[in-house]
């Protein structure tokens, strides 16, 4: 019984910490994880179909991907 109560308390604490992060900051963290580099418009081919600026990631070759409109 103590283990269940402890698990519920820990879950509530984790949820409250997640809610404390603003949505915009969370989006910035997510974009950073995708490997988006908006300053030079390069993107990580493994990051998915979008770049930080909303452009699409186009794989030009095996080693080169760019954010294109």
Swiss-Prot record:
Keywords: Amidation, Disulfide bond, Knottin, Neurotoxin, Secreted, Signal, Toxin. It is found in: Secreted. GO terms for cellular component: extracellular region. Residues 1-20 form the signal peptide. Its main location: secreted. This is U2-agatoxin-Ao1c. Belongs to the neurotoxin 01 (U2-agtx) family. It comes from the Eukaryota. It holds the Pfam family Toxin_7. Residues 21-34 form a propeptide. Insect active toxin causing rapid but reversible paralysis in crickets. No activity shown in mammals. Does not show effect on mammalian voltage-gated calcium channels. Disulfide bonds join 36-52, 43-57, 51-67. The modification Leucine amide is found at residue 68. Expressed by the venom gland. The presence of a 'disulfide through disulfide knot' structurally defines this protein as a knottin.
């Amino acid at each position: 019984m103590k283990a269940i109560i402890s698990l519920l308390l820990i879950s509530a604490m984790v949820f409250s910490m997640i809610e404390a992060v603003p949505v915009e900051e969370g989006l910035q963290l997510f974009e950073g994880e995708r490997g988006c580099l908006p300053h030079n418009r390069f993107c990580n081919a493994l990051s998915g179909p979008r770049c930080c600026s909303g452009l699409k990631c186009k794989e030009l070759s095996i080693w080169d991907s760019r954010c294109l409109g």
